[in-house]
Amino acid sequence: MRIQFGYVAMSMELANASPSKTMTATQFEKIEDHEAGLRKLERIAKTNLHNCLRLLKHNLAYQISFFRLSSKLVPLVNHPLTEGWKYELAIAEELQAVGEFASEHQMRIDFHPDHFVVLNSEAKEITRRSLQTLLYHYKLLKGMEIDPRHRCVLHVGGKKKGVEAGLEQFIENTASIPKSLLSMIMLENDDKSYTIDDVLYLGEKLAIPVVLDIHHHDVLHRSKSLQETWQRIVATWEDSPLPVKIHLSSPLSGEDDPRHHDYINADRFIAFLHEIGADAVDHLHVMIEAKKKDLALFQLMKDLAEYDEITVVSKSAVEFNP
């Protein structure tokens, strides 16, 4: 099994490359000329996308071909103060540059919209805003000329009336979501409400790929064993153009601490690989969700090189052969 590692949003090594520079609503309101305010937002968004391109070039130098882009590329997007703003036209050139570089170097990029995207809410306004956010990500991907399928990982949402009711509300709500947006979605288990079994119920029923978060699973599960569950997870990816992906982080202290450590516990990851087996999939993409970002990836590669069952094949990929 070949394992490709990626990391999230920004580099700890590359200086002055934040992809999420912003402007507050208060700052925007102080600009007397509304159009001038929008132009300033566009300049910030262009800077963010320029830094995204710098990050992808940094990744190329380290043979990292899997990366999660920041969802905060365009400040004040979908805010009432910027209603009607055609931001995607203003940043078209920058979006295209990012997409061309990613495609040229066969990089997989995706997003993880924030926790305000809730698709199982009974409140129509929350659902409307959630779909607005998905449409924003869709526009970014289309501007990059990247296939939008399975590029946005989401959590199921809240459980105000219980887990079962939350799952059924998700199914009901997705019936009215445009196919173009629904096809973007991957679903991830969380550490508070919905276990991997719950997420699989939706993934199998709605044909949505399921992303296993190992750390979340360790914190919240019905059965900690993944031997039976893993093949069901893999099956949800059968119709996807992308390899199976999982999320990897380590607890700050203790096995069930939901807080993320700066780095990754290699022993826990190796134990997971032995549990699912070397023949589980041919290719596995692993998104590292550690506070030290790319530095955590580099350290994990060093740590994994010490295991007999691991063969390092690039600066960001290994082969697992127990």
UniProtKB/Swiss-Prot annotation:
| Entries under PANTHER family matching the protein | UV-DAMAGE ENDONUCLEASE (PTHR31290:SF5)
What biological processes does GO assign it?
nucleotide-excision repair; pyrimidine dimer repair; response to UV
Enzyme Commission number(s) of this protein = 3.-.-.-
Q: What is this protein called?
A: UV DNA damage endonuclease
EC class, as a word, reads hydrolase
Q: Name one Pfam family in it.
A: UvdE
The entry lists its GO molecular-function terms as: endonuclease activity
Please report which protein family the annotation says this sequence is part of.
Answer: Belongs to the uve1/UvsE family.
Q: What's this protein's function?
A: Component in a DNA repair pathway. Removal of UV LIGHT damaged nucleotides. Recognizes pyrimidine dimers and cleave a phosphodiester bond immediately 5' to the lesion.
Q: At the top level of its lineage, which domain of life is listed?
A: Bacteria
**Which InterPro entries does the annotation name?**
UvdE, UvdE_bac, Xyl_isomerase-like_sf
Identify the keywords attached in UniProt to this record, alphabetized: DNA damage, DNA excision, DNA repair, Endonuclease, Hydrolase, Nuclease
NCBIfam families this protein is in?
uvde
* HAMAP family referenced in this protein's UniProt entry, alphabetically: UV_endonuclease
Concerning SUPFAM superfamilies, the annotation shows: Xylose isomerase-like
